[in-house]
């Protein structure tokens, strides 16, 4: 079970997430996000996890191919998460250069908003609740993932519902942001991160 802690805004939080066993550390570059980080801050976050096993992921919902290439070169980010209206074009241009997380937005009723293009299992599909930062899950019981083995469950995952999500859907990974945050300050709660990561790993082992 892979775990991505997304919306990291501080190097200390990245370091603690890596120590807790997070496989991926996500940084958001969307200007309209409360969790948006600058290139300078992202560089510090990448440096904070260099000695561990966590992989830095840049979240790019609105940037051009050229902007993504420039930011990743400046920051040292090695994986990218793509979403937005021109996702197909960006995916075709960047898939040979990066490990890619491909976002499929899901409506509250559990229905995906778009079809999945042809891709191999090297690409990680992330199912996220439309609205992104609402912090609530879509209808997991009504949801059925596409025929693609490597996928993550996102959108409202937290310590209190992770068991249900893994039991119902058996994802290859989970993607969590607000579910491990300290209320009101957009910093991560160390103990919530540790508990959620431990739960994810234990639950995935018990379902094998």
From Swiss-Prot:
<dbReference type="GO" id="GO:0000162">
    <property type="term" value="P:L-tryptophan biosynthetic process"/>
</dbReference>
<dbReference type="Pfam" id="PF00697">
    <property type="entry name" value="PRAI"/>
</dbReference>
<keyword id="KW-0822">Tryptophan biosynthesis</keyword>
<dbReference type="InterPro" id="IPR013785">
    <property type="entry name" value="Aldolase_TIM"/>
</dbReference>
<dbReference type="InterPro" id="IPR001240">
    <property type="entry name" value="PRAI_dom"/>
</dbReference>
<comment type="similarity">
    <text>Belongs to the TrpF family.</text>
</comment>
<dbReference type="GO" id="GO:0004640">
    <property type="term" value="F:phosphoribosylanthranilate isomerase activity"/>
</dbReference>
<comment type="pathway">
    <text>Amino-acid biosynthesis; L-tryptophan biosynthesis; L-tryptophan from chorismate: step 3/5.</text>
</comment>
<protein>
    <recommendedName>
        <fullName>N-(5'-phosphoribosyl)anthranilate isomerase</fullName>
        <ecNumber>5.3.1.24</ecNumber>
    </recommendedName>
</protein>
<dbReference type="InterPro" id="IPR044643">
    <property type="entry name" value="TrpF_fam"/>
</dbReference>
<dbReference type="InterPro" id="IPR011060">
    <property type="entry name" value="RibuloseP-bd_barrel"/>
</dbReference>
<keyword id="KW-0413">Isomerase</keyword>
<keyword id="KW-0028">Amino-acid biosynthesis</keyword>
<keyword id="KW-0057">Aromatic amino acid biosynthesis</keyword>
């Amino acid at each position: 079970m892979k775990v991505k802690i997304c919306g990291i805004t501080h190097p200390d939080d990245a370091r603690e997430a890596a120590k807790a066993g997070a496989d991926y550390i996500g940084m958001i570059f969307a200007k309209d996000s409360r969790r948006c980080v600058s290139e300078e801050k992202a560089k510090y976050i990448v440096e904070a996890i260099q000695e561990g096993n966590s992989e830095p992921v840049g979240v790019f919902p609105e940037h051009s191919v050229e902007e993504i290439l420039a930011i990743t070169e400046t920051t040292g980010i090695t994986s990218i998460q793509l979403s937005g209206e021109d996702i197909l074009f960006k995916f075709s241009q960047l898939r040979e250069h990066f490990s890619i997380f491909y976002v499929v937005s899901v409506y509250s009723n559990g229905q995906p908003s778009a079809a999945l293009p042809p891709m191999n299992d090297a690409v990680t599909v992330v199912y996220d609740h439309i609205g992104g930062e609402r912090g609530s899950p879509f209808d997991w019981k009504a949801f059925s993932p596409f025929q693609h083995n490597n996928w993550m469950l996102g959108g409202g995952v937290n310590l209190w519902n992770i068991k249900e999500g893994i039991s119902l859907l058996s994802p290859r990974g989970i993607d969590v942001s607000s579910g491990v945050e300290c209320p009101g300050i957009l910093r991560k709660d160390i103990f919530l991160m540790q508990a959620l990561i431990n739960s994810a790993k234990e639950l995935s082992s018990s379902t094998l």
